[in-house]
């Protein structure tokens, strides 16, 4: 898998012609390869990273600016506006930020910025567009990843039979799993 990840980065550096963003690279893994389970899950995990980047960036933007909003709406002294023990809406906004795992360092940064007179923060947000920075930051996006299945594999799926994953170095069985589980 390490080699595939390196190849994926290299393919990303060499864009194919035309309007598509994908490089002209195809990766095929045999259904009986010892790394087949990891290969299948590789792209799924990378897609989950994109979802986390997108959701996390938008959550940061929202919650950090809610802290600024609580400070701006304060009608008491300016020193007390940034003190959550005196500014109840600020305390609530900070709690909400912590509830969704906004790091303490970012909350402190917003409070420090507010003390300097800033009224909002621009936190970079990402989207799920294929050409977005979020997708560019994960691996497995620069190739057509496919699995080579054989008639014997399909028969094993149909029969709910065991399926052997074969080491390429010596031909021995690395692991036995249910074909349907892999399917």
Locate each region found by the language model.
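Active-site cavity-forming subdomains of large catalytic enzyme subunits
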Residues: 1-183
